[in-house]
Amino acid sequence: MTILTPPWRMASRLIIVAIAGAAAAAAALSAPKTGPKATVGNDQAIDDTSARLLNQGREVFRFETFGDEAWWTDTIQLHRAIEGQNHGGVGGGVSPATALSVGLKVDIDAIPKKIQDAIARGAVDLNDPAVTLALLQLDAVVGVKATLSDNGNSIQSMGITCALCHSTVDDSFAPGIGHRLDGWANRDLNVGLIVSLAPNLQPIADLLQTDVATVKTVLNSWGPGRYDAWLDKDGKAFRPDGGQAGTLLPPAFGLAGVNLHTWTGSGSVPYWNAYVAATQMHGTQVTFYDPRLSDPAQYPVAARSGSWNTRGVDPGSASGKLDALHYYQVSIPAPKPPKGSFDAAAAARGKTVFLDRAQCATCHVPPLYTEPGYAIHTPAEIGIDSFQADRSPTHGYRTSPLAGLWTHQKGGFYHDGRFATLDDVVNHYDALLGLNLTAAEKRDLVQFLLSI
């Protein structure tokens, strides 16, 4: 039997449904915007911030001096050595050929095509310091920022940027001339030799309580690809055995997810950005604070100079650049090795050795190839002396990230290049840990290290 719903009851139900729908719609309109539309707006804000920081950070990394012209130009007057006496400076000046020979790099993308063609034809004299001034005016010398006179014949001011030590070029145009490779360690750069050319090294001598001749000896002891970022804190110019005390320039790529930076892990990436900008580049705008460095026993020079507590003249401006710089740095991926640069079959076998027999992954945890957290080990744990570790507040050595290792083999391995080859590193750990790896396993392991 079919039961029919009376028309009046059906109409009543429709009215109730309509009223409920209207009430729900009204509630939705009056509710806080936390739904999909708000999410889209928030996502857009994140995307906009990401793009802004990335682009700004690239500019900061490549071109920002943080006001360090006051040191390089006004104080030690390095620009005068670059100019040479024919352009108001001192000495013979620095030609492009000389600049390239000490590891400075030239960004080919900053040079107009017409001039590129002239260089390729040999129509530009690369032994003329005037050409260096022209390259500086074009912002073509990687990591050096200069303002020239109206006629381009002299340098009004000059400073350095992060890219000086932590960028190189791909040599696509000529050795030392090519497209920028941000984040790559410039292991050709002879920082000490370049600084030693400055006409006024007396401020450094006064800081270290020594003479200019000794300062030059120290600067020239480092050699290509090395720099001593602790000399102005502890004054230890040489190792106890008389060897130079500089460390290899580290890369600035593959840092996403990496907590501690540099060889002895004194701080995070933002820590080191402020440390370097304020105390090594000598940026006047940057504030840096670390009371650990005020200990007169460990850091007598810093305790005297106050470099553990610098207050920039425009810290707000600098801080607004340091966040973008950090964002850009952690956005730079570790470069993949070129195809054919390693034995793929051996690398596949070496990965198994890395993860198992050699115990490498215990500390170099994939995919970061360092340890998440506080990745510091004692000198005894890695089987070396404590000299460099004891210059750091950590008194230890950081587990260095291994991705992109193939890009910075020049100068050797470990913080001071004490191991000339990866084979030497593998042999060191084989003996230290009693691994008893076979010759084949060692070869395969090296190929894997070159593949990551």
Language model region names:
Residues 2-16, 21-452:
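Periplasmic c-type cytochrome electron-transfer domains
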